[in-house]
């Protein structure tokens, strides 16, 4: 069974601190400076009921958060080299006080920090992210079994 969950960018840009830079540079072949990078936060998946009437529980979200680190974000679900746009360098489950899911439970989501190297070829993409035009992501995954909750 395959499932897809949608998420959204939760802010325009992340201020790259020393800890962020260290995490990013663990994933790169050379060290990058703050000025060379564009970083942003994005909601990857959550505990809300989706259009297939499925949801992730909190334990699964915690497991997914660990698995997303180091994964590359691609464009249009096409795993080609040219479509690799960003890499996730940190992910964790976050709670949003006062917000509940469709079941009335406290809402939580896997929120990731991702980075891109600033280049001429992605300048327009960064502007579209900052303008809120490019704001949604889709996460694909496979599961071994399906259980009713």
Labelled PLM ranges:
Residues 1-149:
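Signature of dsDNA virion morphogenesis modules
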């Amino acid at each position: 069974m395959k499932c897809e969950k949608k998420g959204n960018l939760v802010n325009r840009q992340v201020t790259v601190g020393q800890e962020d830079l260290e995490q990013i540079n663990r994933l790169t072949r050379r060290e990058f400076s703050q000025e060379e990078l564009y970083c942003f936060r994005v909601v990857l998946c959550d505990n809300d009921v989706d259009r297939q009437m499925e949801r992730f529980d909190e334990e699964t979200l915690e497991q997914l958060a660990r698995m997303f680190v180091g994964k590359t974000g691609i464009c249009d679900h096409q795993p080609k080299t040219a479509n690799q746009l960003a890499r996730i360098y940190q992910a964790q489950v976050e709670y949003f006080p006062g917000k509940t899911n469709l079941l009335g439970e406290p809402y939580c989501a896997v929120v990731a920090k991702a980075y891109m190297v600033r280049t001429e070829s992605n300048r327009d993409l960064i502007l579209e992210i900052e303008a809120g035009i490019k704001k949604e992501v889709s996460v694909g995954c496979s599961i071994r079994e399906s259980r009713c909750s």
